[in-house]
Amino acid sequence: MRLLSFVVLALFAVTQAEEGARLLASKSLLNRYAVEGRDLTLQYNIYNVGSSAALDVELSDDSFPPEDFGIVSGMLNVKWDRIAPASNVSHTVVLRPLKAGYFNFTSATITYLAQEDGPVVIGSTSAPGQGGILAQREFDRRFSPHFLDWAAFGVMTLPSIGIPLLLWYSSKRKYDTPKTKKN
């Protein structure tokens, strides 16, 4: 009997602990390459896996200093009144890196109320980690189609192909006899 009452009490405590909102948040870079002077797209996804709505949800990302990144569109500090249970929200920010080099993309902070009269819950998003921001010149050197380089290569190879062709053609024309027609 004691064991049964202990099990019931433990199950009741577990169900009480799981009540309320529970948010899972992720932060991801959508660009394949981060390039100095080009747009860098960040996406924040917040999922409510709890049993009630999350209230006063605030996402704050202070990991992008203004001297290293310019904001093209979106905001790094966002607030939602509520996120319903079993639903999600997404937020996208477009930044422009101002300097090349390595940068540590750290996690953003998320705060919310799990229940209406409950304490403020503080959490973090996932962190993409350290990534390299390529210089514009390096990116162009690696990934541009190099039309001018190929045109210069073609012009430089023309003499080595064209001169023997002209010599052969003039020799062929000189020593080739035309066929006479018979009527």
From Swiss-Prot:
Cellular component GO terms held in the UniProt record: endoplasmic reticulum; endoplasmic reticulum membrane; membrane
Residue positions with a glycan: N88, N104
Presence of the UniProt keyword Transmembrane helix in the record: yes
An example Gene Ontology biological process: cotranslational protein targeting to membrane
S-S bonds: none
Highest taxon of source: Eukaryota
Keyword Nucleus in record: no
Stretches assigned to the Lumenal side: 18-149
Subunit and partners: Heterotetramer of TRAP-alpha, TRAP-beta, TRAP-delta and TRAP-gamma. Interacts with STING1.
Role this protein plays: TRAP proteins are part of a complex whose function is to bind calcium to the ER membrane and thereby regulate the retention of ER resident proteins.
Family from the record: Belongs to the TRAP-beta family.
Name under which the protein is recorded: Translocon-associated protein subunit beta
Species name: Homo sapiens
